[in-house]
């Protein structure tokens, strides 16, 4: 078990959990996740230097009530070919641990040839163990900084490991689960200010009856309290207040930015909101399903209040109700923690990616079709300060079909480290992530956000748009110091799209009435085969842009012709984020198909545009 090599760190972790201090370590390094209605809790600590994770599972055996506990690591929540550590305890008489994996049909649990679940401590109520990020074992999942899934179960019996395998346990509903998690995450941020100086601002709906339709955007415009309108404050944290987790898809809070136009309070569907309400479009806080609270770094806070701050803010809640449920009452919203003593920098939020428009489309039957959204060098050159900006947080966002999202960073012809990347993105888990590496973006840099979509099983085309059945591609970046640049997004230029439809009509003989006709109708008129899918991908990858380099009032920056703007050129495929350092696979394991690979079941690696280059 190599206990000597980890004595100090194991001591730190184990004693920290029992509140005995043998070394000074902050609680910011400890992350936690409730596995079972707060009865069973997982705590973990990432050791970036040694590239390993320490785990502690509290109340795993419930003081001897259960004898076997399994915790597994899965790429997308699938139960087949999942990497499990299985622990057994019999009233402190003996303890047992096996590194295992599930079979392709999820019927059997097989013991690994190499054992990599290193136990630090076990008793009849808890488990503490560690595992390397990458064990170089094809029978183990590689830990990464994107979305992973924890699969767990427990039994009141011991498993029969005859011939080094057993039947996958059939745990009761209360004693198993699957949860998304970012395992390799940055340390938590502690609010520097004392709790006594924190003030709370709440913006939430007022007992709204959720409409029995698939997609509803509900808006509420409210006036800030006088203590906020008089003095500028900094937001240091915001957290969601969710009434109906199965209906609330995402929420945003916007600042109203107007030129002396009067804003009225409002509470109703966003489509019916007065025109003045649409001036409330500067993002202040946002949340999407799966996320928790978000805390700003100690050097920055998001401005709110003061004499120059419009006293109105707008809450927008997206209800996703595909089952058309009725009779549900909702008062969801945000709690915002603010301080009056300002921090060094004003922070801000910027939208990267694609416009919400039906100019972009995804053909059916694709494994991972890419769409690209650009923040071109000409925009950052005009809009960013001379010393640039620092990005400290990022929230990737798509709707139902998104399976991979990343934002690349370019300075001239040089590609810098990625801003954010999730090769196993899930629309069910769209948290704002603190960035361990904080990109420094200078004027003249370019940012390219790519989203990949899985449309297998869909018979018709998917268009860009606001509905949950449409698609989006966005990266909300949190940065400082604040600038006037609110949106840096793109779409294919109108001329390029017209030329594409004309080609489909004249050359491909598709049933398009007019290249200038409604875009959605033109897309839906195309009969999609592999050749036409390739042509569409090539068109998106090479065509000039309609660029939105926008201020918070929705107006573009002056100084450049944003229509038919040039794309940012870059190399395919996407660079490897974490090159593996394994020497070689042991000869007796070379026959085994790695749990990290598969025939396109690993959507993070089976990417359409990469395979296309090999044709």
Predicted feature locations:
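Exposed beta-sheet edge/beta-hairpin loop segments within beta-rich domains
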Residues: 118-123, 140-143, 284-310, 325, ...
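Noncatalytic modules at the cell exterior or secretory-pathway interfaces
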Residues: 126, 236, 301-320, 439-453
């Amino acid at each position: 078990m190599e206990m000597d090599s980890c004595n100090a760190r194991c001591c730190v972790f184990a004693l920290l959990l029992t509140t005995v201090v043998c070394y000074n370590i902050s609680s910011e390094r400890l992350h936690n996740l409730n596995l079972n209605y707060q009865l069973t809790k997982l705590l973990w600590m990432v050791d970036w230097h040694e590239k390993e994770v320490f785990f502690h599972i509290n109340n795993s055996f419930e003081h001897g009530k259960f004898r076997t506990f399994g915790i597994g690591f899965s790429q997308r929540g699938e139960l087949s070919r999942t990497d499990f550590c299985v622990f057994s305890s019999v009233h402190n008489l003996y303890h047992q641990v096996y590194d295992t994996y599930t079979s392709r049909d999820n019927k059997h649990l097989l013991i690994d040839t190499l054992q990599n679940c290193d136990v630090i401590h076990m008793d009849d109520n808890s488990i503490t163990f560690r595992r390397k990020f990458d064990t170089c074992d094809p029978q183990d999942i590689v830990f990464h900084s994107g979305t992973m899934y924890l699969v767990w179960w427990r039994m009141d019996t011991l498993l029969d490991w005859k011939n080094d395998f057993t039947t996958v346990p059939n745990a009761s509903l209360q004693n198993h689960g699957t949860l998304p998690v970012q395992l390799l995450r940055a340390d938590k941020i502690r609010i520097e200010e004392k709790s006594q100086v924190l003030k709370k601002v709440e913006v939430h709906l007022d007992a709204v009856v959720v409409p029995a339709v698939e997609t509803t955007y509900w808006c509420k415009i409210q006036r800030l309290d006088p203590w906020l309108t008089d003095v500028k404050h900094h937001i240091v944290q915001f957290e969601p207040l969710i009434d109906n987790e199965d209906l609330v898809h995402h929420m945003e809070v916007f600042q109203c930015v107007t030129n002396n136009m009067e804003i009225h309070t409002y509470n109703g569907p966003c489509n019916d909101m007065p025109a003045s309400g649409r001036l409330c479009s500067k993002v202040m806080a946002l949340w999407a399903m799966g996320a928790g609270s978000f805390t700003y770094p100690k050097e920055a806070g998001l401005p709110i209040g003061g004499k120059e701050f419009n006293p109105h803010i707008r809450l927008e809640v997206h209800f996703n109700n595909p089952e058309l449920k009725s009779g549900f009452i909702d008062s969801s919203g945000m709690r915002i923690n603010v301080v009056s003593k300002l921090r060094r920098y004003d922070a801000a939020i910027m939208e990267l990616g694609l416009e919400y428009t039906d100019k972009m489309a995804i053909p059916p039957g694709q494994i991972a079709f890419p769409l690209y959204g650009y923040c071109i060098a000409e925009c950052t050159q005009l809009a960013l300060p001379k010393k640039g900006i620092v990005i400290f947080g990022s929230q990737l966002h798509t709707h139902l079909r998104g399976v991979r999202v990343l934002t690349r960073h370019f300075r001239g012809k040089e590609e810098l480290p990625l801003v954010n990347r999730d090769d196993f993105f899930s629309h069910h888990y769209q948290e704002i992530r603190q960035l361990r590496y904080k990109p420094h973006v200078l004027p003249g840099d370019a940012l390219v956000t790519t989203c990949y979509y899985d449309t297998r099983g869909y018979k018709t085309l998917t268009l860009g748009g606001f509905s949950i059945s449409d698609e989006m591609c966005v990266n909300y970046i949190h940065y400082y110091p604040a600038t006037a640049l609110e949106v840096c997004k793109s779409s294919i230029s109108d001329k390029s799209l017209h030329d594409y439809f004309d080609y489909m009509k004249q050359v491909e003989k598709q049933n398009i009435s007019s290249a200038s006709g409604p875009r959605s109708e033109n897309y839906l008129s195309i009969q999609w085969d592999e050749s036409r899918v390739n042509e569409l991908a090539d068109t998106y990858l090479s065509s000039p842009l309609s660029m939105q380099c926008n201020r918070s009032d929705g107006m573009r920056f002056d100084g450049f012709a944003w229509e038919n703007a040039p794309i940012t050129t870059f190399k395919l495929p996407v660079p490897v984020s974490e090159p593996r350092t394994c020497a070689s696979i042991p000869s007796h394991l070379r026959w085994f198909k790695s749990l990290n690979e598969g025939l396109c079941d690993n959507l993070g690696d089976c990417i359409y545009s990469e395979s296309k280059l090999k044709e």
